[in-house]
């Protein structure tokens, strides 16, 4: 989280909104091909390796099948991708960006982080990610000087991804006997295709948003959307890391001890609510100060989109929980695909209806409403078929939202007294965090008990 916050303000001040918008528009187009290249290997790989990781022969079998399929799929997609870019894209800048981004399809071949995650190699993943990102930050600060370095910026991001994947591959290789094999092809291809469809239905949300903005609203609106999205994502990813870390354990419990699975799921949701609720209110109330500090005045059009993304963060956190921790873990991919497809179509229809008046804020609003419907569908299914509802929508988690909403008058008062954006930002964060923890401490909150700040009791509030 810290490194993107350090480097992104620098990039946004060196590259214009139009350049950032063109990069993001190109990335949205490339993503459609990247998903087909990776199929559903990442999610499927974590789930299956987690289940067989104590049996080395099975680990080798699953890994080799997925790795071999990944090589073949990425090579086939790369051929089709470059042919389309060569003959179908006429804008010179966009074509160059797309050619450079296509290298990521080769990087995808070595993207076996799912194996390391399934084996809970989080220390290695963390150290490697920090080192690679530090090198990325160094390269950007040394090489990116002005708007003429747009292509160079894309090259740096591509090389960083390639290095990251190769290092992970070398580390994982020590624990494997790697062979090019399609022996288990028929066994894994069906669930892979289901997850592929699932991934494709999810691009009917965020990725389609940028595509529509690029076509109907122009590069500047894509940039405003993308800057707000990157700020939200940088924070959201750090918060939701708990969900990804818990995936292997929950996957094991779901198959062997369902009571423990539901208990751990409830705990994970509680931690998520503890963090997501206050951060979302911070983002909404301090959007202007964050944008001025983070991106500068040329991105002032990002303030309103960031406010909508602050609301969206709460909704999408529950989408992720139901999708990854409930539906996929319990092998309900088909239902997830159906629900995502329904809501993705709703989102697409909304974008089409308002295409002539689209802007970054309206796009986020349409997507947020679509995801609300998606959460409702998955929650209803989880309750009816798996007996899961209170584990996710526990009443005790509501206090995190209520306490977070109390930040609003505090921040408004600080803004009334102080004008300087940095002072407003720092004071708001400091005072609100202090208020939040004092209130939670006074009611002996479960999370504070878990981290040792409050003496544990038999019944947690």
Mark where each language-model region is.
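Signature of the first transmembrane helix
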Residues: 1-43, 78, 137, 190-219, ...
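Membrane-interface junctions at transmembrane-helix termini in multi-pass inner-membrane proteins
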Residues: 105-127, 311-342
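Alpha-helical transmembrane segments of polytopic membrane transporters and translocases
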Residues: 9-10, 21-38, 194, 209-211, ...
